[in-house]
């Protein structure tokens, strides 16, 4: 069975609706961390974008889920639908192949 990890970085305000949507889409577990970061816009708001603007790290949520490879497109579509506003700060999605998973309690791989 091929697995992938989908990692999402988005604003704190979007987390609750994203969590509900992922649960409804069949995601059975997730890891969530509060992080600080910014993208190429250096943490600016849309009306502030400036080449010389000093980088500002903004509070974000980082959500990681592991799903079967055949579920990736469906889950990514759910994420994009929940996060999209068309404005700076909607978020980022990263997708990684998982080589192996070991359940510590049982040793199952």
Indicate where each model-derived feature is located.
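Positively charged, small/polar-rich N-terminal and surface patches that mediate targeting and assembly
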Residues: 1-109
């Amino acid at each position: 069975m091929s697995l992938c990890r989908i990692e999402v970085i988005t604003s704190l305000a979007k987390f609750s609706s994203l969590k509900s949507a992922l649960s409804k889409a069949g995601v059975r577990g997730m890891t969530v961390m509060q992080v600080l970061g910014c993208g190429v816009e250096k943490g600016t708001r849309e009306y502030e974008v400036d080449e010389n603007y000093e980088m500002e790290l903004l509070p974000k949520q980082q959500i990681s889920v592991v799903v079967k490879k055949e579920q990736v497109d469906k889950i990514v579509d759910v994420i994009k639908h929940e996060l999209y506003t068309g404005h700076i700060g909607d978020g980022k999605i990263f997708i990684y192949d998982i080589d192996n998973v070991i359940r510590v309690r049982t040793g199952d791989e």
